[in-house]
């Protein structure tokens, strides 16, 4: 029988949260607030957040590690052989909503799930990893999108040439608003149910994705953060943030599962922007920078 080294993953994830928060605090000159919470049914987490900042208008970098004694049938519907096992789930997730409309919003998540072997049974722990990172710009800059995707490709290529194209396509398909017929942003990479290469190789790939976040995103922040903007550009940012809200509340599996299963609402909704706006049948002026964004919201080869 084989046991998954949960403590190694826990140590990596808490270190990743610390590293990202420290880098963002250094970049923005503002401190994250810490909210430590416990889950009555088992486990808890640490939420690090900023609201009303100058660089980051709203941001959350969250770590959670929750566990239970019996995997509920709803969670094992596609793996009925796991029903009744004890389980653990842990991960780091973040969403950053900058104030300047020229700085893109971004999202990153890395996570692991383990269903433990039952005592007295000839079986192994069952694990899988998932995660990804993606970019949601409000104004279209090709060099930003290419940089983000090039870092994603460089993170995955050492693990196999097939990973980046596969995970990039998965991201394009997942972060898609069917009713708007557009992607949420310019994508990135997204994966789930990763365990086939074995624990060590799967965990190494997860670390590569988590470690890619800062080099993928911070150079874009530094490039755009001092770009002057007007209230009209802030209004367009709020309008596009409305699409972010639509995706999260209508399509995002993690948000829907969390809200429907009695998850921690404050953590789940920390992904929401501080302000969003809807306008009836509004269209940007032809040839405007706002209109140019539409060309970024369909799948493209960036790297």
Swiss-Prot record:
Involved in the heme biosynthesis. Catalyzes the aerobic oxidative decarboxylation of propionate groups of rings A and B of coproporphyrinogen-III to yield the vinyl groups in protoporphyrinogen-IX. It comes from the Bacteria. The keyword S-adenosyl-L-methionine does not apply. The keyword Cytoplasm applies. Residues 244-279 are annotated as: Important for dimerization. It catalyses: coproporphyrinogen III + O2 + 2 H(+) = protoporphyrinogen IX + 2 CO2 + 2 H2O. It comes from Bordetella petrii (strain ATCC BAA-461 / DSM 12804 / CCUG 43448). It is found in: Cytoplasm. GO terms for biological process: protoporphyrinogen IX biosynthetic process. Its EC number is 1.3.3.3. A divalent metal cation binds at residues 97, 107, 149, 179. This is Oxygen-dependent coproporphyrinogen-III oxidase. The record marks 179 as: Important for dimerization. GO terms for cellular component: cytoplasm. One of its GO terms (molecular function) is coproporphyrinogen oxidase activity. The lineage of its organism: Bacteria, Pseudomonadati, Pseudomonadota, Betaproteobacteria, Burkholderiales. Keywords: Cytoplasm, Heme biosynthesis, Metal-binding, Oxidoreductase, Porphyrin biosynthesis. InterPro entries: Coprogen_oxidase_aer, Coprogen_oxidase_aer_sf, Coprogen_oxidase_CS. The gene is hemF. Its cofactor is a divalent metal cation. Belongs to the aerobic coproporphyrinogen-III oxidase family. Pathway: Porphyrin-containing compound metabolism; protoporphyrin-IX biosynthesis; protoporphyrinogen-IX from coproporphyrinogen-III (O2 route): step 1/1. The active site is at residue 107.
């Amino acid at each position: 029988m084989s046991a998954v080294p949960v403590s190694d993953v826990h140590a990596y994830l808490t270190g990743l949260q610390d590293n990202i928060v420290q880098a963002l605090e250094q970049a923005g000159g503002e401190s994250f607030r810490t909210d430590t919470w416990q889950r009555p049914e088992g486990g808890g987490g640490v939420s690090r957040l900023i609201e009303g900042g100058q660089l980051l208008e709203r941001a959350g970098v969250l770590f959670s590690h929750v566990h239970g004694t019996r995997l509920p049938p709803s969670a094992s519907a596609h793996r009925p052989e796991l029903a009744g096992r004890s389980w653990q789930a842990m991960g780091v997730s973040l969403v950053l909503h900058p104030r300047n409309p020229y700085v893109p919003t971004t999202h990153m998540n890395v996570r692991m799930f383990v269903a433990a072997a039952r005592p007295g049974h000839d079986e192994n722990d069952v694990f899988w990893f998932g995660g990804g990172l993606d970019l949601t710009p409000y104004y279209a800059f090709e060099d930003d999108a290419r940089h983000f995707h090039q870092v994603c490709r460089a993170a995955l290529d050492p693990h196999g040439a097939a990973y980046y194209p596969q995970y990039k396509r998965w991201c394009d398909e997942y972060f898609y608003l069917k009713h708007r017929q557009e992607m949420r942003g310019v994508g990135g990479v997204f994966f789930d149910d990763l365990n086939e290469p074995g624990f060590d190789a799967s965990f190494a790939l997860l670390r590569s994705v988590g470690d890619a976040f800062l080099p993928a995103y911070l150079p874009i922040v530094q490039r755009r953060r001092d770009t002057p903007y007007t209230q009209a550009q802030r209004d367009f940012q709020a309008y596009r943030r409305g699409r972010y809200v639509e995706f999260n509340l209508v399509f995002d599996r993690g948000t829907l599962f969390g809200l429907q299963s009695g998850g921690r609402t404050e953590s789940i909704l920390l992904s929401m922007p501080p302000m969003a706006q809807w306008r009836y049948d509004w269209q940007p002026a032809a040839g405007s920078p706002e209109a140019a964004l539409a060309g970024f919201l369909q799948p493209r080869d960036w790297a």
